């Protein structure tokens, strides 16, 4: 099954979701380079608070890059252009949060996110994103809570890391 693409969701849903974090989604014309794309098109790009996507950008990529913006500290956000950087803990926080946020995109949801992450090649020591999320992410949950990015019920807190 191919991964879900940006042109297969309501773009207003993604924009509304990310506005809660002060982000803007900007579309890029077909076949054009995507500004801020670390991995190159069709992967999403990130520069400041702007998430760049094309119609062929995977939704998991858009949410992953957005979650980098959410999970990094303000100092890095101020200088953000293309390379989100971050350490191992932050990368895991990004992956966990993108799964939570996927539930707010009706066409996606976490089950589709799990499939798309596995299909794209995200690597987890238990063999799948779902197994990692459900059985091996206690440290990630603690990290996200420490920075108040999720609440005690593991729901997005709709705030940026400070």
Question: Model-flagged regions — what are they?
Answer:
Residues 36, 70-100, 114:
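Post-HEXXH active-site segment of zinc metalloproteases
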Residues 87-89, 119-128:
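Short, mixed-charge aromatic SLiMs
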Residues 51-59, 86, 90:
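Secondary-structure capping and boundary motifs in well-ordered enzyme cores
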Residues 101-117:
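Short helix/loop segments within enzyme catalytic domains
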Residues 60-74:
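Active-site recognition of the HExxH zinc-binding catalytic motif
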Residues 123-162:
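Pan-zinc metallopeptidase signature
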Residues 1-45, 52-56, 100, 104-105:
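Auxiliary, metal-adjacent structural segments of Zn-dependent hydrolase domains
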């Amino acid at each position: 099954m191919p991964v879900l693409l940006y042109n297969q969701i309501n773009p207003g849903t993604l924009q509304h979701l990310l506005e809660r974090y002060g982000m803007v989604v900007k579309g890029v014309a077909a076949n054009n380079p995507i500004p801020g794309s670390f991995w190159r098109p069709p992967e999403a790009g990130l520069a400041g608070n702007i998430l760049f996507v094309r119609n062929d950008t995977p939704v998991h990529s858009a949410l992953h890059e957005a979650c980098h913006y959410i999970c990094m500290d303000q100092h890095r956000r101020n200088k953000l252009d293309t390379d989100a950087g971050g350490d191992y803990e932050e990368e895991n926080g990004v992956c966990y949060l993108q799964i939570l946020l996927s539930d707010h995109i009706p066409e996606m949801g976490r089950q589709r996110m799990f499939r798309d992450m596995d299909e794209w090649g995200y690597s987890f020591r238990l063999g799948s994103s779902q197994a990692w999320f459900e059985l091996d992410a206690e440290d990630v949950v603690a990290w996200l809570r420490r920075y108040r990015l999720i609440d005690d019920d593991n729901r997005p807190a709709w705030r940026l890391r400070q």
